[in-house]
Amino acid sequence: MSKFFVLGTYSPESYEGFIKNPEQDRKALAQALAKAMNAEITGMDFLRGSYDFIATIEANNFEDLAAVKLTFEATRAGKMTILESVDINEIAKKAGTAMSNYVPPASN
């Protein structure tokens, strides 16, 4: 499983729904959507600021989480930004290999 972070904003229609039914459990509904793609929300918080929520999600791959995003956005619930956790040490090792085989453009 890969670890992802999702930052999201809700649409005006979603806010209208919250006002009409302030008791709805948005975390449970989000978890059900994630589970449909064999993903699991391991943490979710609502925020003040540029984003309305942040979630930590474990999923098999990016495509499964992208399907969740498409569903969320297609229903006009809001917008999501998916960020994937990476192994920076492994990336640095690969960059070292790439660098040893790269010739930068000559500067004039």
Which residues are covered by each model-predicted region?
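A compositional/biophysical signature of low hydrophobicity enriched in polar/charged and small residues
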Residues: 1-108
